[in-house]
Amino acid sequence: MLVWLAEHLVKYYSGFNVFSYLTFRAIVSLLTALFISLWMGPRMIARLQKLSFGQVVRNDGPESHFSKRGTPTMGGIMILTAIVVSVLLWAYPSNPYVWCVLVVLVGYGIIGFVDDYRKVVRKDTKGLIARWKYFWMSVIALGVAFALYLAGKDTPATELVVPFFKDVMPQLGLFYVLLAYFVIVGTGNAVNLTDGLDGLAIMPTVFVAAGFALVAWATGNMNFANYLHIPYLRHAGELVIVCTAIVGAGLGFLWFNTYPAQVFMGDVGSLALGGALGIIAVLLRQEFLLVIMGGVFVVETLSVILQVGSFKLRGQRIFRMAPIHHHYELKGWPEPRVIVRFWIISLMLVLIGLATLKVR
């Protein structure tokens, strides 16, 4: 919005030309989302407390979590608000990639909101019925994926980038839709599973978004894209603004979500952020890179799959409790230790992922 306005005002004052610089807009996008998040935090927490929108804690969970019962949840609303406002202010409104991310972000946020509402109002720990949750997540993911396929088939937009192999970029064709679906839905659920400890999900999300901001910048720059042997996508540059908005909103939320948390993001935040990371990876053709940089999310999800599969097939559990962060809690690790160590692992994985762009 402000970019469009600045383009009309630059003829009256050349200083408005600064709004055309991607790096400037990336920085102010981050700061805008950060300040909105920090401003909304106390007000959102007070409002959620007044409405008695408190966290519902399972009775079979770790005993240390019982003290979290009643902590305000659905704080993801402030994350989404900060991201959407910042992106609308600083990104080019005509960019289709930006709107793809916003559709998934808001759509998954609405699904998460309904899920949270059922939990906190009806005191139902299961929330929205699983089949309906996956149905609407699938509708959004398939809708966006199919639209992207129709717009970009037989172009670099539907190629698969394989880490370590610069000349291996198979054209996916219609399989692009299927891959995009699994990446978007899978990442949404993976972040949701990770959101079980104070600050555990938000910081890896910030790290991955920051990593994708660098990838988006390189992908949208023809010289750097050719240098790194990745597809050049002319619309990709504006995803930098989206990624930095996620970073800013995430850091602002962490101010209130750090241990001991004053507020939880709820499904409205975790599903939306996961879906956003998924669609960003799809748009940048970096699905494999997401698996590396988002390794914490992958491990959390695999721990649940292995736990359920092992119990059904052998009648035995692999972990003391899944997702795996609860396993370490039950081993006696203090919650802050689990959180910070997962953060460190996440940062390392993002750096490794970025390194794979050059090691090809």
Swiss-Prot record:
Transmembrane annotation, as ranges: 26-46, 72-92, 94-114, 132-152, 168-188, 199-219, 236-256, 263-283, 288-308, 338-358
Catalytic reaction list: UDP-N-acetyl-alpha-D-muramoyl-L-alanyl-gamma-D-glutamyl-meso-2,6-diaminopimeloyl-D-alanyl-D-alanine + di-trans,octa-cis-undecaprenyl phosphate = di-trans,octa-cis-undecaprenyl diphospho-N-acetyl-alpha-D-muramoyl-L-alanyl-D-glutamyl-meso-2,6-diaminopimeloyl-D-alanyl-D-alanine + UMP
Location of the protein in the cell: Cell inner membrane
Principal location class: membrane
Cofactor: Mg(2+)
Keyword Secreted in annotation: no
Alphabetized Pfam families for the sequence: Glycos_transf_4, MraY_sig1
Membrane topology recorded in Swiss-Prot or TrEMBL: Multi-pass membrane protein
Alphabetic keyword roster: Cell cycle, Cell division, Cell inner membrane, Cell membrane, Cell shape, Cell wall biogenesis/degradation, Magnesium, Membrane, Metal-binding, Peptidoglycan synthesis, Transferase, Transmembrane, Transmembrane helix
Pathway: Cell wall biogenesis; peptidoglycan biosynthesis
CDD domains with a match to the protein in the record: GT_MraY (cd06852)
GO biological process: cell division; cell wall organization; peptidoglycan biosynthetic process; regulation of cell shape
Function of the molecule: Catalyzes the initial step of the lipid cycle reactions in the biosynthesis of the cell wall peptidoglycan: transfers peptidoglycan precursor phospho-MurNAc-pentapeptide from UDP-MurNAc-pentapeptide onto the lipid carrier undecaprenyl phosphate, yielding undecaprenyl-pyrophosphoryl-MurNAc-pentapeptide, known as lipid I.
Family matches, as PANTHER family: PHOSPHO-N-ACETYLMURAMOYL-PENTAPEPTIDE-TRANSFERASE, PHOSPHO-N-ACETYLMURAMOYL-PENTAPEPTIDE-TRANSFERASE HOMOLOG
Family membership noted in the UniProt record: Belongs to the glycosyltransferase 4 family. MraY subfamily.
UniProt-recorded name of the protein: Phospho-N-acetylmuramoyl-pentapeptide-transferase
Organism: Citrobacter koseri (strain ATCC BAA-895 / CDC 4225-83 / SGSC4696)
Lineage: Bacteria, Pseudomonadati, Pseudomonadota, Gammaproteobacteria, Enterobacterales
